[in-house]
Amino acid sequence: MSKTLLVDGDNLFKIGFHGVKELYNDGAHVGGVYHFINTLRRFLDEHNHDKVVVFWDGDSNSSIRKSIYPQYKGNRRQDMNDYKYESYLQQKARVKTYLEEVFVRQVEMMNNEADDLIAYYCKIATQENIIIFSADKDLTQLISERVTIYSPVHKQYFKNGDKISINKVDIPHQNVTVCKIFTGDKSDNIDGIEGLGEKTLVKLFPVMLEKTCTIDEILDYARKNMHPKSPKSLSNILTGRTKSGILGEEFYTTNSKIVDLTNPLITDEGKQLVEQIHTDTIDPTDRGYKNLMRLMMEDGLFNYLPKNDEAWVNFLKPFMKLTRKEKRNTNKN
């Protein structure tokens, strides 16, 4: 099977933009651009991929989930001043231009989140071995025999059979979805069962550490083990009680829809674009290394390369491998 790298673009870009603060060119911050391109370059240098696809959140990307759960991401606040936000947008747009020149495919669609677009790609690309490059643990739901996660933050692979640490509790990857449905997700403002965190969940249902579990199996286990001295959290599970009140089955229906990435929330237009990116070849017209070098010189990135004659060649080599493969695919067709 062919080897494909799927990159969570916003996740990787934010790491560099907020983390690499010292790189500037003529007074303009370029840390986000340099970190993204250099991190991708280094990963490609160490691995052999036939295709690379970067996924971006589209405009109004939360709209589908907000139509189901209005509070979704209601806790997110713009923490950048106007100047910094303008730099963020400019650098992100610049990264996309760089990627065009090195034959990296890109997916972005209004009203669609990158996570769902990635999930849909994994669903349809049944003949590809896939590495997802992201520090977002939500994507660990997609781990399978042919889908592996690489976290650039932990510098660690998460593969089929591994456990995922969620709030310091190691959960088998196949139970991450069920765990998040019950406990919610504070970072996305998704309520969970009141009084139920990951530690309490696995204490009440230790079977979750041993085998794949479904919502119905957990609820059935809760009913069978309910007694007058049971902890309140067990009763809350059966009634679907959150801080917003008793929701019953509606709680599980709603959380399943907005949490479960194995059933991605994606528009028809999003599906069509992913299918197109999956099967189409890349048009090589007007793409090339001269353009890439020009961009790097304009942004002053050459200042951050090693001071030797081979610096440019070594920087470009990993992208050259990918470009040759994509050009061969184009010529076949």
Each language-model region and where it sits:
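Extended two-metal-dependent nuclease catalytic cores across DNA- and RNA-processing enzymes
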Residues: 2, 22, 77-283, 290, ...
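Short glycine-rich phosphate-binding loop at a beta-alpha junction
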Residues: 6, 50-58, 106-108, 129-133, ...
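Long, highly charged low-complexity segments enriched in Glu/Asp and Lys/Arg with interspersed Ser/Thr
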Residues: 286-333
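Generic intrinsically disordered, low-complexity segments enriched for polar/acidic and small residues
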Residues: 33, 66-69, 85, 147, ...
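Short, low-complexity, polybasic intrinsically disordered segments
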Residues: 69-75, 79
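Non-catalytic, usually N-terminal nucleic-acid engagement modules in DNA/RNA processing proteins
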Residues: 1-71
